[in-house]
Amino acid sequence: MSVKGDIGVIGLAVMGQNLILNMNDHGFKVVAYNRTTSKVDEFLQGAAKGTNIIGAYSLEDLAAKLEKPRKVMLMVRAGDVVDQFIEALLPHLEEGDIIIDGGNSNYPDTNRRVKALAEKGIRFIGSGVSGGEEGARHGPSIMPGGNQEAWQYVKPIFQAISAKTEQGEPCCDWVGGEGAGHFVKMVHNGIEYGDMQLICEAYQFLKEGLGLSYEEMQAIFAEWKNTELDSYLIDITTDILGYKDASGEPLVEKILDTAGQKGTGKWTGINALDFGIPLTLITESVFARCVSSFKDQRVAANQLFGKTITPVEGDKKVWIEAVRKALLASKIISYAQGFMLIREASEQFGWDINYGATALLWREGCIIRSRFLGNIRDAYEANPNLVFLGSDSYFKGILENALSDWRKVVAKSIEVGIPMPCMASAITFLDGYTSARLPANLLQAQRDYFGAHTYERTDKPRGEFFHTNWTGRGGNTASTTYDV
């Protein structure tokens, strides 16, 4: 009798192929399938040649070649394609079999699929996979959620192929029910947007404000790798700043300043609005990409307004250290806001997400991997009920130490004309979050004035609502239908 596969993978684009090869390297027998079956032969005769990888040429063939309970992982484009493959797979599966979606699916789709497939006796996992092509091949960060009964069967495979911390801990663990895994991956992507934009803002201040050369900036970022800023994105930025093209000039200087996006940052911002979480920095990072896409309009506006950037005066070494502190403090706010969003979703959906374990998932293997994720894990292990990351003693100390320089950098950027939407939004958030009293009292009075939305009073218990007839003409009826 032929040996059967431990897991099947559908989708032989680069991510799918690399995950399969990774699984094979760790001793798992993988059955590979692609809708265009010629790609199966190409894979088996190419990258998979000489391995124990098994080819399948139909979904029926795939199911027949798998050990029970069958485990089938979809590495296909998010959206309708996932549903199409699920429907096509169902006739070939049995009760208790497992389907895993390893794509960048939107978590409401995963919520729906978990429930719908459970009614058919199929266990569904929605798993975020981060790290790109290299991570898939050598160790990604994996964020599984969904039907927890399936986890025991998938866990040995996923934890074996995932990235590992220096202590050997797998950057993969169960996140929570329904779409928790894909939700956490979505927030990961949003934080990635924020991290990248923050680095770009620091780069622009150093380059255009301080007038530093690429050689000088590369040396600065290389030095920052030895601080709390140590991360994959700082690492690759160091490489990028030092990369010369064939003419010997910095290549990045010749790259058009328009940034693309695939939409996951936007998803994070939309969900923050839906959940009522002030995800200001990540949302600004999405808008920064939007502004960058208006290249022709920006050039025209630059000419119309005669926009110039005034050089920053003063000791450059002092300013460089101030920028480092501002970058680090802003990054803390970005992660703090991201975890606030994860917490809110976990509480609303009953996912019971472990926030310290989530930080560990990102410690290696993914784009936002960084040194201080270990400190985030420590903070949540010390206090699982930590609401705001900046309240932890370690991060509070950094924020307090950075605050003066952070303000100087943001204020100076406004003064000289350097856009810093994320650093500015980060410090503005902290100022708002640490304010015992905000001007929302006036805002609520305005709402009551034009819409009779009522208000609470500082001299009365919370939960008691009042309405004022501000003009003498509006009566005393509170609004229950009109809201702003």
UniProtKB/Swiss-Prot annotation:
NADP(+) binds at G11, L12, A13, V14, M15, G16, N34, R35, T36, V76, R77, A78, N104. SMART domains: 6PGD. One of its GO terms (molecular function) is NADP binding. InterPro entries: 6-PGluconate_DH-like_C_sf, 6PGD_dom2, 6PGDH_C, 6PGDH_Gnd/GntZ, 6PGDH_NADP-bd, 6PGdom_BS, NAD(P)-bd_dom_sf, Pgluconate_DH. The active site is at K185 (proton acceptor), E192 (proton donor). The keyword Oxidoreductase applies. It comes from the Bacteria. This is 6-phosphogluconate dehydrogenase, decarboxylating. It comes from Haemophilus influenzae (strain ATCC 51907 / DSM 11121 / KW20 / Rd). The lineage of its organism: Bacteria, Pseudomonadati, Pseudomonadota, Gammaproteobacteria, Pasteurellales.
